[in-house]
């Protein structure tokens, strides 16, 4: 069995090596000729899976995407050809949630404006939005959720309108899929009018899709409003973001919010489980066995951490400033965006760091944030 796999997917060899011949490929430049004789195709969001890519292949048994979203896959076409498909919903939700939370802590420190006491509006209450809310609520932050689709579907959580978030939230974090038509279109959801209407000193965090914000309008509005603070992990026109926009963001990264070691391993592992199920064989590999031990064994706390100390704990796991600095130095280079993504030194999630502190009730919130070993 020939397994064609994006070269940037981790842990492919230990998981799929027993199932067939593994052929790594560049996902962004993948051609129909390369795919012609593949039995299994494993991709990420940079690969457009459609008739143009697959029309010459008449033996494909499975297409898997190690991503939350599926907007890069023509699901109708796969359905017409009866090609089984699976993605990895939620695989990197924890990573995105922690990234957004860390970014907010970094902004709070940079501008001496504590996160504690602020109101955060989350637009999109799916896997990544929910994970972001979980971090914030663990820390005691008031969260407003906006998701008209989930609200209409009967999700029991409390939702508010986008207008309410615009009026009440100090921070707005975006977590919607990209939809270009229909009642709940998200392309340019934040257009020039909505960006202009943001209340003073709003922090705007985008970890979903670049097209959700009109980037040209964002440049114009930001140049007029220095009070707005931006954290941008996604960009219109990836992998070539607007050169004028990057310097206007407080933190800028190349679509890596979901790039934790745990998240990327989880995505590959979910596809492994699905393929084994399809082939009717036992999935006898373990996700935990894939992950290396963390380079810090444990952190012993003398007191319950304040916000500054919490940021330091977060930086032990992931220092956003490093990726921001690297991105600013490389994004104008040819292939700089993709090079940084490909060579990203997969950060860890909070669960990799064990904390030792004996007053359990004072630090339950750290366990809820995801840190391990608290109070043990």
From Swiss-Prot:
InterPro entries hit by this protein: D-iso_2-hydroxyacid_DH_PdxB, D-isomer_2_OHA_DH_cat_dom, D-isomer_DH_CS, D-isomer_DH_NAD-bd, Erythronate-4-P_DHase, Erythronate-4-P_DHase_dimer, NAD(P)-bd_dom_sf, PdxB_dimer_sf
Binding positions (substrate): 45, 67, 259
Pathways involved: Cofactor biosynthesis; pyridoxine 5'-phosphate biosynthesis; pyridoxine 5'-phosphate from D-erythrose 4-phosphate: step 2/5
Pfam families: 2-Hacid_dh, 2-Hacid_dh_C, DUF3410
GO molecular function: 4-phosphoerythronate dehydrogenase activity; NAD binding; protein dimerization activity
Key words of the record: Cytoplasm, NAD, Oxidoreductase, Pyridoxine biosynthesis
Binding site for NAD(+): 147, 233, 258
Subcellular localization: Cytoplasm
Active-site residue list: 209, 238, 255 (proton donor)
Subunit comment: Homodimer.
Name by which UniProt lists this protein: Erythronate-4-phosphate dehydrogenase
Organism: Shewanella putrefaciens (strain CN-32 / ATCC BAA-453)
Gene from which this protein is expressed: pdxB
